[in-house]
Regions:
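Amphipathic alpha-helix from the class-I
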Residues: 1-11
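Surface-exposed helix-capping loop/turn segments at secondary-structure junctions
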Residues: 7, 27-37, 113-114
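Conserved glycine-rich beta-strand-loop-beta hairpin in the small C-terminal domain of fold type I
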Residues: 14-24, 36-49, 59
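Generic non-transmembrane alpha-helical segments
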Residues: 26-30, 58-68, 106-112
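Preference for bulky hydrophobic residues occupying beta-strand positions
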Residues: 27, 48, 88-90
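Conserved C-terminal alpha-helix-loop-beta "cap" of PLP-dependent enzymes
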Residues: 48-86
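PLP-dependent enzyme catalytic core of the Aspartate aminotransferase-like
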Residues: 65, 81-114
Length: 114
């Protein structure tokens, strides 16, 4: 049983890494010039750093309307040093439907970044 379990975990890790890379590539392409996508080696979240004037609470509210969950940077600090950043879960498969929603969200981010 241990071999099957280890094999399952290895397959799952590979799948999640592939999804994270796909999401990062999508966001980099659609947010170039307005945000930096930070990718760490562990976990399945991406840290998005928008331009300093962007308040990611606005992005959070827009994302909620689209049923996309993000974590505004304000959740990760006691002051506003990360108010222009947000975290997004990249473990989901980038389906056509999810891609369409994320496209709308990235267009919104581009609009408020001007």
């Amino acid at each position: 049983k241990n071999k099957n379990y280890e094999s399952h975990l290895n397959q799952l890790r590979k799948k999640l890494i592939k999804r994270k890379k796909a999401m990062a590539a999508f966001l980099k392409e659609n947010l170039q010039n307005v945000a930096t996508i930070h990718i760490d080696d562990g976990g399945y979240f991406l840290w998005i750093e928008c331009q300093p004037q962007v308040d990611t609470m606005d992005i959070y509210r827009e994302a909620l309307r689209m049923h996309i969950t993000i974590a505004p940077g304000k959740l990760f600090t006691l002051n506003n040093e990360f108010a222009h950043c947000f975290r997004i879960n990249a473990s989901f498969e980038l389906t056509d439907a999810r891609r369409a929603l994320l496209s709308k969200l990235t267009r919104y981010i581009q609009k408020i970044s001007v």
